[in-house]
Each structure stands twice: as C-alpha cells, then as structure tokens.
Amino acid sequence: MRSVTTAFWGKARPSDGSPSATHPLPAHVLDVAAVAGLVPGHLPVEIDRRTLGFLVALHDIGKFSRPFQAKVPEAWPADALGPYPDLNRPPSGPAHDLVGLSLLGDTLAERLTPILPGGREGWLHLDRGHVWRALAGHHGRPPNPADDYQMSNKIVCNGCKGAAEKFVDDMIAVFQPPPWPKPAQGFDIVRFSWWLAGLTTLADWIGSRQEWFPYVSAETVADPAAYYHGHALPRAKKALAAAGMAKAVIAPFTGLRGLFPRIEAPTPIQRWAEAVSLPDGPSLTVIEDLTGSGKTEAALTLAHRLMDGKRANGVFLALPTMATANAMFGRLADSYRALFAPGSNPSLALAHGRAGLDKRFVAAIEGGAAREPRRGDPADEPAEAHCASWLAEDRRRALLAQVGVGTLDQALLAVLPVRHATLRLFGVTGKALIVDEVHAFDPYMRRELATLLGFHAALGGSAILLSATLPRKLRAELVNAFRAGLGVRKRTELMESSYPLATIAGVASVSETPCQPREGLPRRVTVTRLADQGAAVERIVDANRTGAAVVWVRNTVDDAITAVAALREHGMEPMLFHARFAMVDRLEIEREVLRCFGRDSAGEDRRRVLVATQVVEQSLDIDFDLMVTDLAPVDLLIQRAGRLWRHERGPRAVPGPELLVVSPEPVEAPAVGWIKAVLPGTASVYRDHALLWRSAREVFRRGEIATPEDMRPLIEVVFDRDAEGALPPALEASADDAYAKELTRIGIAAQNVLDLRKGYDVTAGAWDPDTYTPTRLEDRPHVTLRLALLVDGKIVPYADDPDTRRAWALSEVAVAQYRIASCPIPVGLERAAETAKADWGRWERESKFVLLALLVTDGDRYRLDARRENETPVIAWYDALTGLAWS
C-alpha cells in the first residue's frame, strides 16, 4: 500500500534516462542518512549511530510543505494534498529550512521528545534548538527565523502536518533510535551542532548525486526499512568510495624511517617527534626551529602517531601561499601513502588543484555542471547545484581528502560566516592540522588562526604549528586559544626562551622542551649594507661572473621588474619570479627555479641570477650562494637568509654565505622619508618604518646573523616597540599608524570570525549573504583577471589545456583593483565573451572581482586595454617572462 509520505517528492531534477521523474522524499532522506552513517571519522560526543542516522533523516522534513511541493506542479502530491492550487497563484511561503525548523521545534516536538528526553537533567527547548538548526541549516548557512519562522506554522497545512507525523513514525521504525541522554556538559551540545551541520551538508551533497542514488518510484520506498537496508546503505558505501572518501586503514607507526626511508640520520627535532610522550586527547604542538631542520618531517611523524593512536584520520597541511603549497604537494607525493596500510587508496588533494589529484576524488565533482538551478532562496536550490558550484574550484576539495595540501585560507574559511563553512570545518575535523610558516601571517590571519585552533580542539582535533621562530606572546596566544577550545579557561604563561623549542599543550598541561639544532645548521651569515640599487647591480654582476647562484629579493613586483631591466643593461638574462604571472606561466617558472636552485641542482644550471619577490621566502627548497635583498622586518631577513648555503655542496663561487641588504643607513636620528628615499616600494609595503629602522640597526650593528643563538634575541629586541630608543621621533608617526592598523585588523578579525560558543546559529556570525568576509585583509582590494586570446573569432583561455575549466584557472592573474577595475570587451565581441564565460562556474560569472581580460598581440608581447576605477583608460602588457606590467 502506498504511504502518504511517498507522495511527496524530495528531488525533481531527473537526469537523462532516469526511470522516474521524481525521487520520493523518504527515499532521499534515507539516502542521505545512509551516507552520514558511513562517513568515516570519530564522533565528537557520545551518541548512538542509530540515533545519529535518525536525526540526519529529519534534515529535509521542511519539504512537507505546500510552497515547496508547488515548485514542481507536475509532481504535486495530489493524493495527500488534493488538487494543485491555481497555477496563477501557487502557494508561497518560507523556504523549507525554516519550515523544517518550525516542524522540529514546535509542531513535532511531542513526537521527538522521547528521542531527546527532557526532565530535570534532560534536554531543554534551547538545547534541542541547537540540533534542529544544524539539521535544517544544511544549505550553507544556519536558518534565520525572523518573521518567516512565526509564519511557518500557518504554512504547514493539516495534510503536510499529518504526512510529517507519519514520516517521523516511519523513521523511528527504520532506525529504532535509543534515547539520547543530554550530555553532562552543555558545551558538548554546542560543539556538536557545528559538527552535525557539516556532516549533514556533506551527506546531503553525496546523497543528492543521481549517478550514485538514481531516482526510484514511490513503490520502491513503500517499505522504508527495506529500502534503507537493501538500497540506500549499499549505494552509500559505493558512493563514498567513488567520492574518494571511503575509510582508509591507517598504517601502524614504525618510526620516522617508515615514512621517510631516505632519512639516514634523523635530526634532533625529528628524534624528539618520534619519542615524545603525547598528552591524552587533542593536543597542540608548536615547533620552532631553523630552516632545514626537518620540521615538516617531524610534523608528519607526529601526525602519523596521532593517526595510529586513533586521534586523527588524516592530515591537512596549510601553507601561506600557493607556491609553498605546490612545493609541499611535491614533497608529499612520494610519502603520503606510507601513512596508510597497503591496499588503501587514500585521497590526496592540492587545495588549488594545480597537480594530479586522486582520480576517485575528482569523480566527486565530475558531471556536476548539470542544468543551472532556478534562482531563489539558497535553501531551496538543489544540492546538486551546490556540489557542482562549490566543488568546481579545485582549491575547495582538499579539506575533504584524507590528505590535503593547500593555503591556510581554505581552512580559515571554516571559521568565517561564509557559505559551507561547516562543510569545511567538518573536513578539518578529525585530521591532524599542520600549519607551516606561522610567522608569515599578519595580525588579522593570526586572529583567524587562533579561532580555527579553538574550533579544531573543541571538535576533537589536534594541530601542529611550524615556524622559524615566534614571539613568546604570539606562541602563548595560540596555545591559550587551543586550550580554550578544550574548555580550559585559565590562561597559561609560557616562560621558555630557548631556541630551537618544542611546545606541547593538552587539556591537562603545557610543556616546553628545548632542542638541539641540526648538525651543520649553526652558522654565521655575514650581513653587508648596500646603499642603493646601483650598488646591488654591481655586486650581482661581479658574483655572476664567478659562476655564483645569486638571488635578489625585492619587496614589490614593480621593483623586481625594474631590477631585471637594470641587469639586462649589463648583458645578463636573469629569471623573474613573482605573483603577477598567469598561473600557467608561474608554475613553469616555479619548476625552472627548483631545477636551477633546488636541492639537486648542479653545474651550469646554478650559474644563474634570480630576481624574485617574497614568494621565495617560504617553504621552497632552494639554495643560493649569494643573496641581495631589500630591507625588510628582521624576521623576514632571517627567513630569506635561510636560503643561503642551505644544502651541502662542493666548493662554491663565493667564500661564505653573505646577505647584502639594500638599505639606507640606520642613523640615530633618521628623517621622516628615511626609507622612502631609497626604497619607495618598500615604504608602501612595510608601513612601520620604525620597525624597518630597528631591523637595520640590529643586523648592521652585529654585522652577521648567527643561528641559532641570534634568533630569539633578534626577534624580541626588534619587535619591542616600547624599549628605550625604539621609536625615533621622525618615524614615530608611521609606527603609531601601523600599530593602530594592526589593532584595527585584530578587531575586524574578532568581528568577522564565528563564535564557537553560540553554536550553529545566525547569532554566531554575520551570515548575511551580501557580506564579503575575507580570509586576508588587503589594504587594496584585488581583482582576478582571466587572460584570454581571440582565435578564429572565438575567445579562448590564454592557457592551453584540454579541460576548459582548468584552462581558465591556469589563465588567472591577480592585480590590485586600483590599477585595473574593468576590462571592456571590444565592440562586436560581446556574444563571443558570453560564450567564453559559459564555461566558467556560476560564482566566477557573477563576481565583480573576476574579469575577462582579452589580450591582443603587439609584437613579442600582449597588450591589454583596461580601465581604472575612475574609468580612466590604462594599458597593461603581458608576456611569459615578465608577467603583467605597465608602460
């Protein structure tokens, strides 16, 4: 006999060849519940999986409503609701997430109370609300009751109410959920709400894919229990495997060499990682050590131990830039499988998708670009559309893979009020989160990172932070943020000032362990001041004649391009590496940089000069004989110096490691324009000119950087703005302005990040869909240019790739919006432009920050006609060796 519930449709976008035009609502929710029950990973609270499955099955209960069912007139459930209303006046009302919230919280409360029992120590209405919002808000944001919530009881007609009641009874019969006693700690319900929202979103995404869950007839789900066990569960198992998310068995930890067999002699920090006693429960480890000490291998060793101890089921490595993520992906490609047992095929993903991804994981988004949904409330857009648009950008996949590598931004989006934040949060949950180059993040991102650590700890995750060195205050801030997520309210004071240093924090204690430096790393780098660019060119020309591998690190792209032009006037052909290249060219240059200056480089390949921006500061395993650098804050100078004489080699073309710093002399009483007179670009990048002055004063006074003994003292003295003589009067204004901006950034970050303790709720953050919440604060907003060419009347991507979407991604270059705000399409090519954009994702098509930039051949380079924000015409030039430049 046909049940009244099966008359209601849950999905109504049949693929070609589908045996049914609709997918019954009970079938869809059972598909999703089956996926949720099989998604691998730990549960953040004690809950029976039968109860969890039952709860997830309630996620779309709001579809028992006339307004939702009326969206597809031909699928109207006439058996339950009578004839379809007037076609000219279809039922209207709140989206189905709000209807669901009302049904769960009010209309069906009596039926659901036995599952979440009340009483003196039991569930309160407020407690249950956290669970209902997590289930109803599975379309990217928590439901916002406002006025519509008050209306939704009126919208649920008697026929819908009766069907919803029968549906709940059916689901209880299928899952037979035991009552879930209220957790002893109220905070457990709050943190569970974040996790449940992410799980439900992910399960709904997978459970909505027709290739994995084809539509069935109402008769097929007439017996819900038979459908669940005989249909939904087997398909869910196959779907998770096809998505690259099936459980991967962890390999037993056998020591560092089990992961890295080529390492003959572990470094001190690696030996520490092998043997240190890890605290019970989630832990935070902070490793501060020299460049080249093996921090990454030590972190992966700790991660493997956590995985083997069932405290993590994967790893996500977060880095500051795409270049560093690319380099880390390459380093992991040969070793990540050692984390898992033979026969496992774990997913490996690069956050911005510029390298080979696991084919099964890629399958999760293939075919997702089906028909575009009707525009309207996001809660009523089909889940397939969210899957396709949300996953179309490769960088978003990494958080769901067993092993992911990407920029920290991708993880930080998990704690910002952006769509699908909880899906990202769920992706991080349960993994060992490794964050590299922590010193490279500004105050805004550090506040975001602190929030992420709190969320991660609350959901049972462990984290490992890597840095050359951190100010003690910052290290304490991150440790306390993590422990706050564990419920520890008392702040911990960190006392140890040794270097290298390893810090481990758990719920019960914090330990600080001094470590020895790696043998061969302690050294002294001579520091020499150069008065200007001309002096730098002379030293580079001389060094190049001797066959030295030389790098000149400039603080702006424009200065880097100028430096290349100056060197070319001396008959040299330096390589240029910066962030203003199309991705396809940037990746090629990156490969060439690693070939010429990487660990395995030798001979004539190394007789080169590289001019680069800050992209060479972090995680690229490259090594130079001589370095010239523009003046920068001392921590960056130390980081850059780490690229000198990094690898063991034979005789070099210069007598010893030397850091040549282009800088004005740090006189006792500098003028207001002290830095701008010599390095105007640097003055605009590093706004605290007193910090630059203190950096110059200290390194030139010492005449060398001795590691490791100088690391901590240099950082502490330069960053102490309150010390006597730290603020020359003429530079005090710039220092105060920079400090005020730093406090402002921290304040903005505090406003932007989600509030863990409010649970998954609209009050936890500014969830307004029209509000843009960035992971990084930019002094100047940027736009993304998608470079294009006109070929045989068609506009095609600048990059050549058989995958059109990938080709467009490889054609991207970011530029400050004040320089290019728009790229007008030439008259007559408007239709060609629209055709080209049809291959873009919907977000890219609609974003005002993504521009189609048509290049025109002009001699041996390309010309781009664009406009500034005030509509003033501007001409830019592009070629694969220089990047984007202006006349």
Residues covered by each model-derived region:
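A substrate-engagement module of RecA-like helicase motors
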Residues: L332-Q402, L408-L412
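Conserved Walker A/P-loop ATP-binding site and its immediately adjacent core
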Residues: G314-Y336, L350-G356, L470-L474, V557
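Conserved interdomain linker/interface between the two RecA-like ATPase lobes of SF2 helicase motors
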Residues: L486-A560
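Accessory nucleic-acid engagement/destabilization modules that flank
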Residues: M1-P19, P24-A251
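Walker A/P-loop
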Residues: G281-A303, E437, F441-D442, S467
